[in-house]
Design a protein with these regions (language model features):
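Charge-rich, intrinsically disordered N-terminal extensions
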Residues: 1-176, 204-207, 217-219
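C-terminal secondary-structure termini that scaffold catalytic or DNA-interacting sites
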Residues: 272-275, 279, 375-397
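Flexible interdomain linker/hinge and immediately adjacent N-terminus
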Residues: 53-73, 169-203, 247-254, 286-295, ...
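Basic, Lys/Arg- and aromatic-enriched nucleic-acid-binding interface segment
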Residues: 196-226, 330
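Catalytic-site neighborhood detector that most strongly recognizes the C-terminal catalytic loop/helix
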Residues: 249-254, 351-382
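Conserved tyrosine-mediated DNA breakage-rejoining catalytic core shared by Y-recombinases
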Residues: 222, 232-267, 357
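Active-site/catalytic core of tyrosine-dependent DNA strand-transfer enzymes
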Residues: 263-320
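Active-site-proximal segment of tyrosine recombinases
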Residues: 229-230, 324, 334, 341-353
Length: 397
């Protein structure tokens, strides 16, 4: 309408220095009223265009620290493709993590937008050809700017397309992709914080809300993923042979135990006591104030830390405002283990890895530090050797 309410609005988020697009409050309330007024009828949840995940009766593999409530298929404009994708995603809900399914949805919606623009006559994934897929691969490499690497994106898209083929008994769909379609895994060096940066961060973390501070300090001391720290349960501690052990139930991987110091155990006990005093008996140690049945949400923790960084003007070694990431603490933990000359299997166990596949990344961090710290000495030795070589008769450099 010409003078109606805007469906979106712009809001400057000073913490991240970005202008975000969001739905105005009045529109959110109107949508809630509309959904409430609509009759359920005989329509199954998996037939709707927006699925409310709590309406499915089977258990879902969700990440407790991420607040995913719905799966929205409206971004797929092709009606037949939308139906096909719904069928596959419903199957995936039975055994895949919600995070992986959301990644599939992002990849599929991106592909469907491309089809609508370049191949509007394609109305079903069963109509795809190898030529269309090759054109899409070229588009990703030359025009798409949404991410640096589309490897995982393409794997998610392939799962959806091939499972559509399996469901409709079209085995030829599996020939749409070949192994060389997928970009190689990007080579990168893990980021980490210097000891000075960690010191600055912790000095200010200690001034934050006490339970948030405990969560962040434990996160550093345990070397876990942030999802594993925030989902620590109140019964995670045990004592064997006069030593404390902690049970870590990894959201993304295996459950494992490791020994911890008395100091770390006391910090955990203090965190449990705080939660019990304020919220009673709970499942998780670090709980959401508005809903103690749920753990701290990652978005809340990230926002609070970014606020603290801006307020206290914490900067990195290059003078830039610190770019905070909780996983960097895990990198620092792994780096310290390599510097202690611990063998790879022990490092993998302490990090909760099932294999040695990722340990070499932490070794690279350690090697880089060694190179940086010894560069001045090595350059001085090189200069001495160069002077000696120059004095050799008949020797050319």
């Amino acid at each position: 309408m010409e003078k109606g309410y805007a469906l979106t609005s712009k809001k400057y988020r000073s913490v991240y220095e970005i202008v975000a697009t969001e739905t105005p409050g009045i529109i959110k309330h109107m949508k809630k009223i509309l959904r409430y007024s609509q009759k359920d009828g005989e329509c199954l949840e998996q037939e709707r265009d927006v699925w409310e995940l709590d309406k499915f009766e089977f258990p879902l593999r969700s990440n407790p620290i991420k607040n995913v409530k719905t799966i929205n298929f409206k971004g797929i404009s092709q009606i037949t493709i939308r139906k096909e994708v719904k069928t596959v995603i419903f199957m995936h809900l039975k055994y895949m993590a919600i995070g992986s399914i959301m990644a599939e949805m992002v990849a599929t919606k991106r592909f469907c937008r491309y089809l609508a623009l370049r191949y509007p006559k394609i109305i079903s994934l069963l109509d795809l050809t190898r030529d269309i897929m090759e054109s899409y691969l070229i588009y990703l490499q030359t025009e798409a700017k949404e991410r640096k690497n589309y490897r995982s994106d393409l794997y998610g898209l392939r799962r959806v397309i091939e499972d559509v083929g399996n469901h409709y008994d079209r085995q030829d769909i599996k020939n749409l992709f070949i192994s060389t379609d997928f970009p190689s895994t990007p080579r990168y060096l893990f980021k980490f914080y210097s000891d000075e940066t960690i010191k600055k961060l912790n000095e200010n973390i200690f001034q934050m809300d006490e339970q948030i501070a405990r969560a962040l300090i434990l996160h550093q001391l345990l070397g876990t993923r942030i999802s594993d720290t925030l989902t620590l349960k109140t019964d995670c501690l045990s004592i064997r042979e006069n030593r404390y052990f902690i049970r870590i139930e990894q959201v993304k991987s295996i459950t494992f135990e490791k020994a911890i110091s008395d100091e770390i155990a006391q910090l955990i006990i203090k965190s449990i006591d705080y939660t019990e005093e304020h919220y009673g008996k709970t499942k998780y140690i670090f709980v959401k104030k508005e809903d103690p049945l749920r753990p701290f949400q990652y978005s809340m923790l990230q926002h609070r830390v970014m606020q603290m960084i801006r307020k206290n003007d914490i900067r990195d070694e290059n003078g830039e405002l610190l770019n905070f990431g909780t996983h960097t603490f895990r990198h620092c933990y792994g780096k310290k283990l390599t510097e202690m000359h611990i063998d790879d299997w022990m490092i993998a166990r302490l990090l909760g890895h099932k294999t040695l596949q990722s340990v070499h990344h932490y070794r690279k961090i350690g090697n880089k530090i060694m190179a940086d710290e010894t560069r001045a000495v090595r350059e001085k030795i090189d200069m001495i050797l160069m002077d000696v070589v120059k004095e050799w008769d008949g020797y050319e450099i």
